[in-house]
Amino acid sequence: MTDFTRHTPETAPAAAKPVLEGAQKALGFVPNLYATMAEAPALLNAYAQLGELLNKSSFSPTEQQVVLMTNNRLNGCDYCMAAHTTISQASGVPADVIDALRTGAPIADAKLEALRQFAITVNETRGWPTQSDLDAFFAAGYGQQQVLEVILGTAFKVLSNYTNHVAST
């Protein structure tokens, strides 16, 4: 595969510098994903902004990780799965939920399992859930807002998972 450039805050295009500098300050390092995305500042900035928007969604941190880790697994992104395992642990996601998300096993919590199943459906149908898929999601206590937020989470993971695939981060 092509050896993609991994930028530092010093080598990044000007439009990418603020995100890399923010990551360096917050984490103490620049993740390889960000360093790679910096080559296309629009991608890096879109990814960072989508992440901020997802954090403002109606989903709890655990629900966010259900959507994100489900997409990581379905998209075969080991890098993101490892990163989100660490994020999930730091966010207080129960260990049994993390294990289920990593392996694709059902989650014991019925509402979280409904979310996982719906995230699978959105990913595998490329956004074409059936009415019965929607009805099952609604019956679990979710609404139209959460349908759209699953799409947001799925889009967020497409950016990172696909970047990791082509750049082998």
Over which residues does each language-model region extend?
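Hydrophobic alpha-helical segments
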Residues: M1-T169
